[in-house]
Regions:
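P-loop/Walker-type NTP enzyme "switch/lid" segment
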Residues: 1-26, 125-129, 134
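Conserved catalytic-core segment of NTP-binding enzymes
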Residues: 15, 19, 23-26, 30-125
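C-terminal lobe/tail of nucleotide-utilizing enzymes
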Residues: 76, 80-186
Length: 186
């Protein structure tokens, strides 16, 4: 279910949300409730009916602070399971020290990491076209696939995400550029 798009998030109560989810359970294996940003009424509605929370954050200080606050609220509300997805990771910035690494974010938030998604223009293109990125042969498509499999209970090592990123390509590009520069006598 998508997050409410109206300003009035109070039109549905937490009890109504619980009833709605109970009505949907016989029809679906998974019911995903998209939560609005922030911790207002819409957030409280979503967690009232949830059996599991997946916190999605980016490796930016303000986003991590918000995620930490959300995790604290989920803990206080006795959420049975809290997982983490780190989105919009830019390895070039991580290498320069301008962005926190996956390990840094995961260590700070101390919840189960189920996936990472690199910052990828294919996601924007796919979204603008109204086409799903999951299931495509792009890196981000694979990352979404791995996350979905983990949500479904498949025990995939997070190394699969790293392998899908093909981090070694960074070194190859660099080597090619060095070779190109050397061959041009620069």
């Amino acid at each position: 279910m998508p997050a409410a798009q109206t300003r009035d998030k109070t039109s549905v109560t937490p009890e109504q949300m619980k009833k709605l989810v109970e009505q949907l359970k016989p029809e679906y294996d998974y019911i995903i409730i998209d939560c609005p940003a922030g911790i207002e009424h819409g957030f409280k509605n979503a967690i009232a009916a949830a059996q599991r929370a997946i916190v999605v954050t980016t490796p930016e200080v303000s986003a991590i602070r918000d995620a930490d606050r959300i995790i604290g609220i989920l803990d206080a509300n006795e959420m049975p399971r809290i997982d983490l997805v780190i989105n919009k990771i830019r390895m070039d910035m991580v290498r320069r020290g301008d962005m926190m690494s996956v390990d840094d974010v995961s260590d700070i938030l101390s919840v189960n990491l189920i996936g990472t998604i690199m910052d990828d223009e294919n996601i924007v293109i796919s979204s603008n076209r109204g086409e799903p990125i999951a299931g495509t042969k792009t890196k981000s498509g694979k990352e979404y696939e791995y996350i979905a499999k983990r949500i479904a209970g498949e025990a995939l090592d997070l190394d699969n995400d790293v392998k899908s990123l093909n981090l070694f390509k960074w070194f190859k590009k660099k080597d090619k550029d060095v070779h190109k520069i050397q061959s041009q006598g620069l």
